[in-house]
């Protein structure tokens, strides 16, 4: 009879997990849809003009080439390569057009000349009243798509069900950034608010889709929240101390002119970049610690609060070194070209390390590392409370004690009011 009861409990738990799983997916889709509608309110996007509409095409024939002399710079010669291309998309699909690829001598790196079979983007340009099709770019996105597909296949092979859930969570994460977060920024809405909303959605959807709705997921979510909160606080404090303007590069200047009536808050954009850049590492640390401590709880059967907390801190010490390196190296790698350029043309090391662009990159790495460090003890403490019986008793006893104190205060007030009434009655009787 007990085995039947256990089996029915397992079935009910698995059924609950499936219901929560599908509800999470449904709520995520609904959340993205509503969030996109709100974020796109009054959004001003840079629309493509007719002259810059790109078409996918394939080079079918090279028809010739000629040298071009530049009169404003004597001795400078360029080259124009003429070719035929077959358009493969849109209303002009299967149309063969005459196109040109222009080279100028001012390009520092020699570009690849087109050849038959190349997949390229072309656009129609109008010069001196004459229209011609011009080479725009090589199509590079196809290779990226294939690389992503290979990555997804490997996830499915090695991860199986977890691999599929990982792909699903990645899709939701990307959609949250591109359908909610970026449109909200471009529409001039509060960047701090949308950063918090995006972080909440990414953490909740990722943990509930990849993992079950259990104590481990709860501990991970609370650990992530603590790390993100620390990142918020440190960024706000440091922002006022080091006098950031948000003008870290040329792209930042261009952002100011997107909305002249209501310019984008560049400092807030730097802030959101720091938080969103660190959230992945924070989630990684939180789930690693909560998962490992859950296994410890299962093996020890009845571990103490101290055992879980100590184990969590030990695991965290092993994780924090590599994860901090991961964050710092990721930021250095993403801006390596600019760092090399600034290092080459700035003779003063003091000036170099006070440039806002360098300071912002260092700040991103440091704030992310602080968030990781705070997530380790926070997740360990939360796991110790949730996973252990004495931890739960400690929390419930605190709540019960508070309830008792509130009740006693109420009783004291009632007794005090009765005493006052009694005194008034006695005074009236004497009179």
Model-predicted regions and their roles:
Residues 1-49:
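Hydrophobic secretory-pathway targeting helix
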Residues 15-22, 215-228, 322-326:
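Alpha-helical transmembrane segments and their helix-start/interface "positive-inside/aromatic belt" motifs
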Residues 27, 31, 177, 202, ...:
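Alpha-helical transmembrane segments of multipass membrane proteins
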Residues 50-79:
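Structural detector for short beta-strands of small beta-barrel domains
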Residues 105-142:
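Extended, hydrophilic extramembrane loops/domains of integral membrane proteins
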Residues 149-256, 264-277:
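Transmembrane alpha-helical segments that form the functional core of multipass membrane systems
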Residues 232-367:
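Generic detector of multi-pass transmembrane helix bundles and their immediately adjacent loops
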Residues 318, 330-431:
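Hydrophobic alpha-helical transmembrane segments of membrane transport and translocation systems
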């Amino acid at each position: 009879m007990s085995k039947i009861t256990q089996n029915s409990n397992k079935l009910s738990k698995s059924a609950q997990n499936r219901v929560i799983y599908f509800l999470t997916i449904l709520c995520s889709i609904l959340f993205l849809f509503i969030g996109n509608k709100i974020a796109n309110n009054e959004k001003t996007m840079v629309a493509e003009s007719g002259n810059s509409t790109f078409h996918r095409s394939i080079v079918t024939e090279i028809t010739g080439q000629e040298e071009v002399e530049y009169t404003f710079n004597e001795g400078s010669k360029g080259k124009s390569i003429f070719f035929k291309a077959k358009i493969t998309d849109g209303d002009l699909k299967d149309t063969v057009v005459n196109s040109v690829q222009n080279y100028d001598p001012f390009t520092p790196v020699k570009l690849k000349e087109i050849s038959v079979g190349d997949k390229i983007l072309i656009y129609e340009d109008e010069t001196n009243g004459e229209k011609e099709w011009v080479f725009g770019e090589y199509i590079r996105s196809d290779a990226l798509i294939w690389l992503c597909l290979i990555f997804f296949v490997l996830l499915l092979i090695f991860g199986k069900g977890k691999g599929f859930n990982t792909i699903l969570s990645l899709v939701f994460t990307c959609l949250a950034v591109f359908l909610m977060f970026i449109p909200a920024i471009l529409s001039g809405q509060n960047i701090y608010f949308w950063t918090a909303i995006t972080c909440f959605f990414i953490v909740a959807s990722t943990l509930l889709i990849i993992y079950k709705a259990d104590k481990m997921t709860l501990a991970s979510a609370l650990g992530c929240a603590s790390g993100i909160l620390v990142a918020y606080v440190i960024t706000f404090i440091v922002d006022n101390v080091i006098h950031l303007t948000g003008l870290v590069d040329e792209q930042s200047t261009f952002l100011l002119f997107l909305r002249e009536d209501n310019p984008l808050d560049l400092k807030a954009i730097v802030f959101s970049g720091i938080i969103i850049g660190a959230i992945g590492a924070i989630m990684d640390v939180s789930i690693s610690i909560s998962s490992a401590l859950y296994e410890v709880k299962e093996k020890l059967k009845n571990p103490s609060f101290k055992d879980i907390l100590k184990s969590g801190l030990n695991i965290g010490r092993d994780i924090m070194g590599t994860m901090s390196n991961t964050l710092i190296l990721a930021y250095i790698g993403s801006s390596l070209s600019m760092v090399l350029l600034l290092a080459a043309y700035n003779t003063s090391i003091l000036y170099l390390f006070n440039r806002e662009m360098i300071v912002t990159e260092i700040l991103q790495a440091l704030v992310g590392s602080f968030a990781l460090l705070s997530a380790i003890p926070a997740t360990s403490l939360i796991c110790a409370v949730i996973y252990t019986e004495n931890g739960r008793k400690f929390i419930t006893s605190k709540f019960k004690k508070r309830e008792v104190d509130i009740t006693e205060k109420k009783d004291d007030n009632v007794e005090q009011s009765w005493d006052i009434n009694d005194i008034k009655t006695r005074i009236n009787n004497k009179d």
